[in-house]
Structure formats: C-alpha cells, structure tokens
Amino acid sequence: MIARRNPEPLRFLPDEARSLPPPKLTDPRLLYIGFLGYCSGLIDNLIRRRPIATAGLHRQLLYITAFFFAGYYLVKREDYLYAVRDREMFGYMKLHPEDFPEEDKKTYGEIFEKFHPIR
C-alpha cells in the first residue's frame, strides 16, 4: 500500500484549489459528462420499459444537470491534481538544474532536408 504524501486529512478539494481558475462551462469534458447523464436517462427508460426518448424528459434534464454538476467538481479536482504535480516537477527541476541541461536550439533549415523539385 502506498502511503500518502502528507498527513493532512483527505479532502475532495483543498483550500489551495481555490487559487486555480474555474473550468469553463463549455469544457469538452463537462459536455461529455453531461451527455453521459442524458444517456443514463435513456438507459433508465429502457430498463423500465418506457418510451426511450420521450418519457420522463424532466428526469433526463435532472440527470444531465446532476452529472454536469458532479463533473464540474471532478474536472476541478483533476486540474488541481495536475497543478500540484506540475508544481512538484518544476520545483525539482529548479533544485536540480544539472539533470536538465539546456538543449541547443535548431533552425528549421537544420532539421529539414533541402528541397529539390523534380519535374
């Protein structure tokens, strides 16, 4: 079993997650999760042997809203975890610059072969 990095009690979103910008409401991940909510409403109708697309439109809207709301916080948590990982990685790179030497920048002329048109 892997031990947690810090002994702080487990929280879904710590206070330092508030400093990050919120996810956009048109984020494709949120739209996908909302679509999953719509599909779950359709599957619910299918399981209960109701007309699939037309029965319980209010229920389908509730599923979409609930999934979108839960997805918003899941995306926010994912962004926070990526930010923590990036902070640790860049901190390590700053403390150990000898492990990450600067590479010489090449021009496009050095990368690509010379072009000779053939007619």
UniProtKB/Swiss-Prot annotation:
It holds the Pfam family NDUF_C2. InterPro entries: NDUC2. It is a single-pass membrane protein. One of its GO terms (biological process) is positive regulation of ATP biosynthetic process. One of its GO terms (molecular function) is NADH dehydrogenase (ubiquinone) activity. Keywords: Disease variant, Electron transport, Membrane, Mitochondrion, Mitochondrion inner membrane, Primary mitochondrial disease, Respiratory chain, Transmembrane, Transmembrane helix, Transport. It is found in: Mitochondrion inner membrane. One of its GO terms (cellular component) is mitochondrion. The chain crosses the membrane at residues 56-75. It is linked to Mitochondrial complex I deficiency, nuclear type 36: A form of mitochondrial complex I deficiency, the most common biochemical signature of mitochondrial disorders, a group of highly heterogeneous conditions characterized by defective oxidative phosphorylation, which collectively affects 1 in 5-10000 live births. Clinical disorders have variable severity, ranging from lethal neonatal disease to adult-onset neurodegenerative disorders. Accessory subunit of the mitochondrial membrane respiratory chain NADH dehydrogenase (Complex I), that is believed not to be involved in catalysis but required for the complex assembly. Complex I functions in the transfer of electrons from NADH to the respiratory chain. The immediate electron acceptor for the enzyme is believed to be ubiquinone. Belongs to the complex I NDUFC2 subunit family. Complex I is composed of 45 different subunits. Interacts with TMEM242. This is NADH dehydrogenase [ubiquinone] 1 subunit C2. It comes from Homo sapiens.
